[in-house]
UniProtKB/Swiss-Prot annotation:
Similarity comment text for this entry: Belongs to the MafA family.
Lipid group attachment sites (S-diacylglycerol cysteine): 19
Residue runs in coiled coils: none
Membrane topology term: Lipid-anchor
Entry keyword Metal-binding: no
Keywords: Cell adhesion, Cell outer membrane, Lipoprotein, Membrane, Palmitate, Signal, Virulence
Location(s) in or outside the cell: Cell outer membrane
Protein name, UniProt field: Adhesin MafA
Keyword field contains Lipoprotein: yes
Organism placement in taxonomy: Bacteria, Pseudomonadati, Pseudomonadota, Betaproteobacteria, Neisseriales
Organism: Neisseria gonorrhoeae
Ranges for region Disordered: 288-320
Amino acid sequence: MRARLLIPILFSVFILSACGTLTGIPSHGGGKRFAVEQELVAASARAAVKDMDLQALHGRKVALYIATMGDQGSGSLTGGRYSIDALIRGEYINSPAVRTDYTYPRYETTAETTSGGLTGLTTSLSTLNAPALSRTQSDGSGSRSSLGLNIGGMGDYRNETLTTNPRDTAFLSHLVQTVFFLRGIDVVSPANADTDVFINIDVFGTIRNRTEMHLYNAETLKAQTKLEYFAVDRTNKKLLIKPKTNAFEAAYKENYALWMGPYKVSKGIKPTEGLMVDFSDIRPYGNHTGNSAPSVEADNSHEGYGYSDEAVRQHRQGQP
Protein backbone atom coordinates (compact mmCIF):
# COMPACT_ATOMS: atom_id res chain seq x y z
CA MET A 1 0.00 0.00 0.00
CA ARG A 2 2.73 2.45 0.99
CA ALA A 3 4.94 1.64 -2.00
CA ARG A 4 2.08 2.08 -4.46
CA LEU A 5 1.42 5.54 -3.02
CA LEU A 6 5.00 6.78 -2.92
CA ILE A 7 6.01 5.68 -6.43
CA PRO A 8 3.56 7.95 -8.32
CA ILE A 9 4.36 10.80 -5.95
CA LEU A 10 8.10 10.54 -6.63
CA PHE A 11 7.45 10.28 -10.37
CA SER A 12 5.24 13.38 -10.31
CA VAL A 13 7.84 15.35 -8.37
CA PHE A 14 10.49 14.84 -11.04
CA ILE A 15 8.09 15.40 -13.94
CA LEU A 16 6.32 18.48 -12.61
CA SER A 17 9.18 20.05 -10.68
CA ALA A 18 10.65 23.45 -11.49
CA CYS A 19 12.84 22.31 -14.36
CA GLY A 20 12.63 25.13 -16.86
CA THR A 21 14.12 28.31 -18.24
CA LEU A 22 13.20 31.77 -17.03
CA THR A 23 13.82 34.53 -19.54
CA GLY A 24 14.35 37.97 -18.11
CA ILE A 25 13.38 41.19 -19.82
CA PRO A 26 16.22 42.14 -22.23
CA SER A 27 18.34 44.81 -20.61
CA HIS A 28 21.82 46.20 -20.76
CA GLY A 29 21.58 46.71 -17.01
CA GLY A 30 22.67 49.72 -15.02
CA GLY A 31 26.15 51.13 -15.01
CA LYS A 32 28.99 50.17 -17.32
CA ARG A 33 28.31 47.28 -19.70
CA PHE A 34 30.51 44.31 -18.86
CA ALA A 35 32.99 42.90 -21.36
CA VAL A 36 31.11 39.71 -22.25
CA GLU A 37 28.01 41.65 -23.25
CA GLN A 38 30.12 44.07 -25.28
CA GLU A 39 31.71 41.14 -27.10
CA LEU A 40 28.38 39.49 -27.89
CA VAL A 41 26.62 42.65 -29.09
CA ALA A 42 29.58 43.59 -31.28
CA ALA A 43 29.91 40.05 -32.67
CA SER A 44 26.25 39.77 -33.67
CA ALA A 45 26.34 43.22 -35.29
CA ARG A 46 29.57 42.48 -37.18
CA ALA A 47 28.25 39.14 -38.44
CA ALA A 48 24.96 40.64 -39.65
CA VAL A 49 26.70 43.48 -41.48
CA LYS A 50 29.49 41.30 -42.89
CA ASP A 51 26.95 38.88 -44.39
CA MET A 52 25.28 41.58 -46.50
CA ASP A 53 25.40 40.80 -50.24
CA LEU A 54 26.61 44.05 -51.85
CA GLN A 55 27.83 42.71 -55.20
CA ALA A 56 25.22 44.74 -57.11
CA LEU A 57 26.65 48.00 -55.70
CA HIS A 58 30.16 47.53 -57.05
CA GLY A 59 31.42 50.73 -58.66
CA ARG A 60 28.53 52.83 -57.39
CA LYS A 61 28.33 55.80 -55.05
CA VAL A 62 25.78 55.17 -52.37
CA ALA A 63 23.96 57.17 -49.73
CA LEU A 64 23.12 55.24 -46.57
CA TYR A 65 19.82 55.48 -44.73
CA ILE A 66 20.05 53.59 -41.42
CA ALA A 67 17.18 53.35 -38.94
CA THR A 68 17.35 51.47 -35.63
CA MET A 69 14.46 50.24 -33.54
CA GLY A 70 14.42 51.95 -30.13
CA ASP A 71 14.16 49.77 -27.05
CA GLN A 72 12.85 51.11 -23.78
CA GLY A 73 11.52 49.14 -20.85
CA SER A 74 11.94 47.98 -17.31
CA GLY A 75 10.94 44.94 -15.30
CA SER A 76 11.14 43.35 -11.89
CA LEU A 77 10.50 39.80 -10.78
CA THR A 78 10.53 39.04 -7.05
CA GLY A 79 10.22 35.69 -5.36
CA GLY A 80 11.46 32.30 -6.44
CA ARG A 81 9.84 29.48 -8.31
CA TYR A 82 6.66 27.82 -7.09
CA SER A 83 6.80 25.40 -4.19
CA ILE A 84 6.49 21.78 -5.26
CA ASP A 85 4.86 20.60 -2.05
CA ALA A 86 2.11 23.15 -2.64
CA LEU A 87 1.13 21.19 -5.75
CA ILE A 88 1.97 17.62 -4.77
CA ARG A 89 1.65 16.19 -1.28
CA GLY A 90 1.94 12.58 -0.26
CA GLU A 91 1.02 11.39 3.21
CA TYR A 92 0.40 7.91 4.63
CA ILE A 93 -1.15 7.39 8.06
CA ASN A 94 -1.57 4.00 9.76
CA SER A 95 -3.63 4.31 12.95
CA PRO A 96 -4.13 1.41 15.43
CA ALA A 97 -7.60 0.16 16.37
CA VAL A 98 -8.80 1.87 19.55
CA ARG A 99 -11.60 0.60 21.84
CA THR A 100 -12.84 2.37 24.95
CA ASP A 101 -15.05 0.73 27.64
CA TYR A 102 -16.98 2.84 30.14
CA THR A 103 -18.51 1.69 33.45
CA TYR A 104 -21.38 3.83 34.72
CA PRO A 105 -22.56 3.69 38.43
CA ARG A 106 -26.09 2.46 39.10
CA TYR A 107 -28.27 3.06 42.14
CA GLU A 108 -31.61 1.61 43.31
CA THR A 109 -34.47 3.70 44.78
CA THR A 110 -37.36 2.20 46.84
CA ALA A 111 -40.53 4.12 47.77
CA GLU A 112 -43.36 2.84 50.06
CA THR A 113 -46.81 4.53 50.21
CA THR A 114 -49.82 3.77 52.53
CA SER A 115 -53.33 5.08 51.89
CA GLY A 116 -56.69 3.85 53.30
CA GLY A 117 -55.32 0.60 54.49
CA LEU A 118 -53.46 -0.01 51.23
CA THR A 119 -49.70 -0.14 51.04
CA GLY A 120 -47.67 0.33 47.81
CA LEU A 121 -43.97 -0.42 47.20
CA THR A 122 -42.08 1.10 44.21
CA THR A 123 -38.52 0.14 43.30
CA SER A 124 -36.48 1.92 40.50
CA LEU A 125 -32.95 1.43 39.10
CA SER A 126 -31.07 4.50 37.73
CA THR A 127 -27.69 5.06 36.05
CA LEU A 128 -25.59 8.21 36.48
CA ASN A 129 -24.51 10.01 33.28
CA ALA A 130 -20.91 10.28 34.47
CA PRO A 131 -18.81 7.11 34.06
CA ALA A 132 -17.23 5.76 37.18
CA LEU A 133 -14.59 3.85 35.18
CA SER A 134 -13.10 4.29 31.65
CA ARG A 135 -10.75 1.81 29.97
CA THR A 136 -9.15 2.36 26.53
CA GLN A 137 -7.41 -0.41 24.59
CA SER A 138 -5.33 -0.05 21.37
CA ASP A 139 -4.65 -2.98 19.10
CA GLY A 140 -1.75 -2.85 16.57
CA SER A 141 0.97 -0.24 15.87
CA GLY A 142 0.58 3.24 14.39
CA SER A 143 2.82 5.10 11.89
CA ARG A 144 2.79 8.28 9.83
CA SER A 145 4.98 9.28 6.84
CA SER A 146 4.91 12.32 4.55
CA LEU A 147 6.78 13.53 1.45
CA GLY A 148 7.34 17.10 0.29
CA LEU A 149 9.80 19.06 -1.85
CA ASN A 150 10.35 22.82 -1.92
CA ILE A 151 12.42 24.46 -4.65
CA GLY A 152 12.89 28.18 -4.21
CA GLY A 153 14.77 28.63 -7.46
CA MET A 154 15.90 32.10 -8.38
CA GLY A 155 14.22 35.09 -6.92
CA ASP A 156 14.53 38.84 -6.93
CA TYR A 157 15.48 39.13 -10.61
CA ARG A 158 15.56 42.83 -11.51
CA ASN A 159 16.19 44.85 -14.65
CA GLU A 160 17.03 48.51 -14.86
CA THR A 161 15.18 50.81 -17.21
CA LEU A 162 17.06 50.91 -20.51
CA THR A 163 17.19 53.23 -23.47
CA THR A 164 18.97 52.62 -26.75
CA ASN A 165 22.42 54.08 -26.42
CA PRO A 166 23.13 56.50 -29.30
CA ARG A 167 26.72 55.24 -29.28
CA ASP A 168 25.46 51.72 -30.02
CA THR A 169 23.67 52.98 -33.11
CA ALA A 170 26.65 55.08 -34.15
CA PHE A 171 28.89 52.02 -33.73
CA LEU A 172 26.57 49.96 -35.93
CA SER A 173 26.50 52.74 -38.54
CA HIS A 174 30.30 52.82 -38.57
CA LEU A 175 30.42 49.04 -39.03
CA VAL A 176 28.19 49.36 -42.08
CA GLN A 177 30.37 52.10 -43.57
CA THR A 178 33.51 50.06 -42.85
CA VAL A 179 32.13 47.02 -44.70
CA PHE A 180 31.11 49.20 -47.67
CA PHE A 181 34.59 50.72 -47.79
CA LEU A 182 36.31 47.31 -47.60
CA ARG A 183 34.04 46.02 -50.39
CA GLY A 184 35.16 48.90 -52.61
CA ILE A 185 31.85 50.78 -52.46
CA ASP A 186 31.95 54.55 -51.98
CA VAL A 187 29.69 56.02 -49.28
CA VAL A 188 29.00 59.66 -50.16
CA SER A 189 26.56 62.40 -49.23
CA PRO A 190 23.05 62.15 -50.71
CA ALA A 191 23.81 65.05 -53.09
CA ASN A 192 26.61 63.06 -54.77
CA ALA A 193 25.04 59.59 -54.69
CA ASP A 194 23.63 57.60 -57.57
CA THR A 195 22.22 54.86 -55.32
CA ASP A 196 20.21 54.85 -52.11
CA VAL A 197 20.76 52.01 -49.64
CA PHE A 198 18.19 51.56 -46.87
CA ILE A 199 19.09 49.52 -43.78
CA ASN A 200 16.48 48.90 -41.07
CA ILE A 201 17.74 47.44 -37.78
CA ASP A 202 14.75 45.65 -36.26
CA VAL A 203 16.50 43.79 -33.44
CA PHE A 204 19.64 44.95 -31.64
CA GLY A 205 19.61 43.76 -28.03
CA THR A 206 20.34 41.08 -25.45
CA ILE A 207 18.48 38.16 -23.88
CA ARG A 208 19.36 36.46 -20.60
CA ASN A 209 18.21 32.93 -19.68
CA ARG A 210 18.61 30.88 -16.52
CA THR A 211 17.93 27.12 -16.61
CA GLU A 212 17.31 24.99 -13.52
CA MET A 213 16.98 21.21 -13.73
CA HIS A 214 17.92 20.04 -10.24
CA LEU A 215 21.32 18.55 -11.10
CA TYR A 216 21.97 20.67 -14.20
CA ASN A 217 21.92 24.48 -14.21
CA ALA A 218 22.97 27.03 -16.80
CA GLU A 219 23.29 30.78 -17.30
CA THR A 220 23.00 32.04 -20.89
CA LEU A 221 23.45 35.52 -22.31
CA LYS A 222 22.55 36.12 -25.96
CA ALA A 223 22.84 39.13 -28.26
CA GLN A 224 20.84 39.35 -31.48
CA THR A 225 21.09 41.64 -34.48
CA LYS A 226 18.44 41.43 -37.20
CA LEU A 227 18.38 43.81 -40.13
CA GLU A 228 16.75 44.24 -43.52
CA TYR A 229 18.34 46.14 -46.43
CA PHE A 230 17.66 47.05 -50.05
CA ALA A 231 19.15 49.39 -52.67
CA VAL A 232 17.51 51.65 -55.27
CA ASP A 233 19.03 53.18 -58.42
CA ARG A 234 18.33 56.92 -58.34
CA THR A 235 18.26 57.22 -62.13
CA ASN A 236 15.56 54.70 -63.04
CA LYS A 237 14.18 53.99 -59.53
CA LYS A 238 14.69 50.26 -59.95
CA LEU A 239 15.71 47.93 -57.16
CA LEU A 240 19.36 46.96 -57.41
CA ILE A 241 19.04 44.82 -54.29
CA LYS A 242 15.65 43.48 -53.34
CA PRO A 243 14.80 43.47 -49.61
CA LYS A 244 16.98 40.91 -47.83
CA THR A 245 17.21 39.94 -44.18
CA ASN A 246 20.27 39.10 -42.09
CA ALA A 247 19.94 37.73 -38.55
CA PHE A 248 22.73 36.55 -36.25
CA GLU A 249 22.90 35.53 -32.61
CA ALA A 250 25.98 35.46 -30.36
CA ALA A 251 25.76 33.47 -27.11
CA TYR A 252 27.76 33.04 -23.91
CA LYS A 253 26.84 30.06 -21.71
CA GLU A 254 27.98 28.80 -18.31
CA ASN A 255 27.11 25.23 -17.24
CA TYR A 256 26.76 24.26 -13.57
CA ALA A 257 26.04 21.12 -11.55
CA LEU A 258 23.89 21.84 -8.49
CA TRP A 259 24.91 25.47 -9.06
CA MET A 260 28.54 24.54 -8.50
CA GLY A 261 30.99 25.66 -11.15
CA PRO A 262 30.82 26.61 -13.90
CA TYR A 263 32.39 23.41 -15.13
CA LYS A 264 32.04 24.53 -18.76
CA VAL A 265 32.00 27.95 -20.46
CA SER A 266 31.22 28.29 -24.15
CA LYS A 267 30.86 31.12 -26.67
CA GLY A 268 29.58 31.01 -30.21
CA ILE A 269 27.77 32.82 -32.99
CA LYS A 270 25.31 31.48 -35.53
CA PRO A 271 22.56 32.61 -37.91
CA THR A 272 19.19 32.78 -36.20
CA GLU A 273 15.59 32.98 -37.35
CA GLY A 274 14.77 36.01 -39.47
CA LEU A 275 12.20 38.73 -38.96
CA MET A 276 8.64 37.76 -38.20
CA VAL A 277 7.57 40.05 -41.05
CA ASP A 278 9.85 41.21 -43.87
CA PHE A 279 9.36 43.19 -47.09
CA SER A 280 10.85 40.67 -49.52
CA ASP A 281 7.43 39.94 -51.05
CA ILE A 282 6.41 43.57 -51.63
CA ARG A 283 6.27 44.67 -55.27
CA PRO A 284 5.80 48.23 -56.62
CA TYR A 285 2.41 49.09 -58.09
CA GLY A 286 4.13 50.50 -61.18
CA ASN A 287 7.37 49.66 -62.96
CA HIS A 288 9.59 51.45 -60.46
CA THR A 289 9.72 52.51 -56.84
CA GLY A 290 8.72 55.88 -55.40
CA ASN A 291 10.29 59.13 -56.55
CA SER A 292 11.33 60.47 -53.14
CA ALA A 293 13.76 59.22 -50.53
CA PRO A 294 13.50 59.87 -46.79
CA SER A 295 14.61 63.34 -45.73
CA VAL A 296 18.07 63.52 -44.20
CA GLU A 297 16.96 66.04 -41.60
CA ALA A 298 13.85 64.03 -40.65
CA ASP A 299 15.61 60.69 -40.36
CA ASN A 300 18.72 61.95 -38.59
CA SER A 301 17.36 64.40 -36.04
CA HIS A 302 19.02 62.48 -33.21
CA GLU A 303 22.75 62.28 -32.73
CA GLY A 304 24.20 58.91 -33.62
CA TYR A 305 21.28 57.78 -35.81
CA GLY A 306 21.24 57.26 -39.57
CA TYR A 307 24.13 58.87 -41.41
CA SER A 308 27.48 59.38 -39.83
CA ASP A 309 28.21 62.93 -38.66
CA GLU A 310 30.61 63.39 -41.57
CA ALA A 311 27.98 62.43 -44.16
CA VAL A 312 25.47 64.88 -42.66
CA ARG A 313 28.08 67.65 -42.62
CA GLN A 314 28.94 67.07 -46.29
CA HIS A 315 25.25 67.08 -47.21
CA ARG A 316 24.66 70.38 -45.44
CA GLN A 317 27.70 71.98 -47.07
CA GLY A 318 26.47 70.86 -50.50
CA GLN A 319 23.09 72.54 -49.86
CA PRO A 320 23.68 75.97 -48.31
